[in-house]
């Protein structure tokens, strides 16, 4: 279960962008946050994976406050696909493999390879595995980032305008 409890956030020198946001989301459920530009949708998602730290309030995953978890532990539980996709000279396979990084302590395992293969297969990226991201269209890069997020096997998947380039 995901619990956002009285979350507040403001940017330095700016007006409050999140004011007393609260909701609970049961496992297996979906939540869409809709609104105009600049109302805090992306900010909420960034607070939900501790890219940003809220001024007050709490985000909990299965009862554990994100503030008590290490960034590595958060990365195991929360995958975030940003609306802006990097344009990098990394292969599709290597970018998706980055999704497994929080689990890697002694190198890449057979399970890591299997999870990455399945994420790429699910999004029809197998034929692109050796191509570089900077050679792909915006939509193709967005699919790669989604595959990377799925390869994390997260408890919580946060998608910030995941189809803006598709």
Question: Which residue ranges define each predicted feature?
Answer:
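Conserved ABC ATPase signature
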Residues: 132-136, 140
